[in-house]
Amino acid sequence: MKKIQNVFAAIKTGLLAKATCVTVNGSKRVFEVLSAFENEGLIRGFQIIDIKTNKVSIYLKYKQDMTSLLSRIKAVSVNKEKLYLKGKVLTKFYPRVNLYFIESKFGLKTLPQLQLRNKMLKTPIGGEIKYIIEINKVNPKLQELMKKKNEI
């Protein structure tokens, strides 16, 4: 869990500094999360630099105006406080902007992947919510208009 939080911190720092690449220590879980990030289009990719020390280089992704796609990365379930969702709740759960990573008996999956898998099963399977990623998709001009509208 500490390695994942270190990776999240390195990604956040890299995004704030507008870096194109950050280097972190890897593990099996780190590779799972990074491949999921890559599949969802949140990073450009990652590459193993050194196999002996498990050094991984993460290539960050930005929009054309150099704003990041990620607005916040949060580790939800920690050792003492774990958050679980039942399978029936997962089928009715449709977040708009956030991306949820859920640990189930199928491994670490995003919410849409797990919902798709649950459609094929007779009894839906739930899991533990591990991470919540807030995606920065709102256009800044639209955001300003919404603020002005709320002020009136």
Swiss-Prot record:
Listed GO biological process terms: translation
Residue runs in coiled coils: none
The keyword NADP is annotated on this UniProt entry: no
Pfam families assigned: Ribosomal_S8 (PF00410)
InterPro entries: Ribosomal_uS8 (IPR000630), Ribosomal_uS8_sf (IPR035987)
Superkingdom per UniProt: Eukaryota
UniProt-recorded name of the protein: Small ribosomal subunit protein uS8m
Family statement drawn from the similarity comment of this UniProt entry: Belongs to the universal ribosomal protein uS8 family.
Gene Ontology MF, one: structural constituent of ribosome
Compartmental location: Mitochondrion
Cellular-component GO terms for this entry: mitochondrion; ribonucleoprotein complex; ribosome
Keywords linked to the UniProt accession: Mitochondrion, Ribonucleoprotein, Ribosomal protein
